[in-house]
Amino acid sequence: MKHLKIDHLGIAVPNLEQAIAAYEALGFRVGATHDVPTEKVKTAFLPLGESHLELLEPTDSSSVIARFLEKRSGLHHVCILVDDLDGALDEMRAKGVPLLDQVPRLGAGGCRVAFVHPKGAGGVLLELKERERT
């Protein structure tokens, strides 16, 4: 499995507009926003070098992000960009790494993603994102 880079850091926020204002005050600019109905979140991506910060606001109290914010706030996940998501999942399964997603699903912007259980990654929720093929 070839890792290309950290794609983004996902940060759970209770209010997207307030969070954007705080980051803009630091000099960040919003690169893209997405409504992800399947995950019940709104997101904003802020470029940071070759990576991004992803701010995530829940749109429903039943979303994973809403439940996360009830317990804590802040860093939610680290996203690793990979060449071949199916191959990466196969390799992780072969090594006994617990997965939250056995098959890829669509993430923000329509890209293919899958999550690794924090128990298999030292307590960190990892998102694997497949690099767009050109």
Label for each model-derived stretch:
Residues 1-18, 75-82, 131-134:
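N-terminal beta-strand motif that seeds the catalytic metal site of vicinal oxygen chelate
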Residues 6-13, 23, 46, 53-56, ...:
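Short, structured motif recognition centered on aromatic/hydrophobic residues
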Residues 35, 44-49, 53-54, 80, ...:
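Vicinal oxygen chelate
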Residues 6-7, 26, 31-40, 59-76, ...:
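A cross-kingdom feature marking solvent-exposed beta-strand/loop segments within repeated
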Residues 50-53, 60-62, 85:
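Short, charged/polar surface micro-motifs in flexible loops or helix N-caps
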